[in-house]
């Protein structure tokens, strides 16, 4: 029985990536030398959690720092970009916190009075 693949990291250059058959799978550059293939969008998992626990949009908070987080940055959800995040993600965010390695999630939670 085949297992579903959720994420693949490929160490390659941009030139080398041109020869990789992606078969329509969504991909983003994780780092300059690493291509990330993530066939399942993260928002899908959030929708499943919302359905299971009967949550509404106002109860959803997402944190992100990379282009693979873009699908979660929906206007109806509270979106928080990490300070070290990619510029396009920061543009979509409702709040930008400190870097991930500077306790950015903690800082945002304190800022909004969640803790």
Where are these regions (language model features)?
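Asp-based, Mg2+/Mn2+-dependent phosphohydrolase catalytic module
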Residues: 52, 75, 79-115
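Conserved acidic, metal-coordinating active-site core of Asp-based
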Residues: 1-75
């Amino acid at each position: 029985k085949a297992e579903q693949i959720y994420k693949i990291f490929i160490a390659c250059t941009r030139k080398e990536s041109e020869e990789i058959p992606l078969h329509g799978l969504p991909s983003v550059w994780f780092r300059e030398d690493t291509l990330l293939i993530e066939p399942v969008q993260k928002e899908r998992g959030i929708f499943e959690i919302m359905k299971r626990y009967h949550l509404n949009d106002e109860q959803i908070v997402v944190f992100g720092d990379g282009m693979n987080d873009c699908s979660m940055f929906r206007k109806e959800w509270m979106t928080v970009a990490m300070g070290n995040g990619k510029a396009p993600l920061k543009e979509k965010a409702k709040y930008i916190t400190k870097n991930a390695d500077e306790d950015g999630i903690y800082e945002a939670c304190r800022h909004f009075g969640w803790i």
